[in-house]
Amino acid sequence: MFVNFQIETERLHIRPYRICDASALYELQKQPEVNFYIPEPVYSLKEIEDIIYWSIDMNKKNSVNHIAKFNLSIIEKASQKLIGYCGLGPSDFELTSTELYYALSHDTWGKGYATEATSALLQYAFSIIGMETIIASVFPENKKSIHVLEKLGFQFKETVQNLEKSLHEYEGMLYFQISKELFLQKAVLK
């Protein structure tokens, strides 16, 4: 369910990280436009490789009852290039919740890839894994990402505040949530 995971959409192939993705993921997270909206440092190539090996190990440990981390590469079918990543995992500031996250190369923004990839992942999470609720957090300045979440049916819950000092980078983020019922209703209406 997690190790051999594959999703095909009209334009994308979504699959677990592979070590051959390291240099593309490294270049992606170095893009200033992308990194600006990610509350993490820019990692070295070696650190990216370590994250990939760790992600492969996590996929072996993931289960329907507990997703430790589910990191996925987004490949554009036409070019066969890695253009981004998405995934599911515990929220850093609310460990009991599963969070959707994604990032795409700046040169692909505005083409609907984020919506296409995350919609497919949510469909899998709700219909196959059996999750009931998924959250997402986004910086208020990231209007394009807010639009993606709203298009998917996520509803704004609150602004993240009063976190402990070690989580200060998440302070002020907007917290969104979607239920299985709402997502599947929205999918039927399309």
Say what each PLM segment does.
Residues 1-36, 71, 75-190:
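Acyl-donor (CoA/ACP) binding surface of acyl/acetyltransferases
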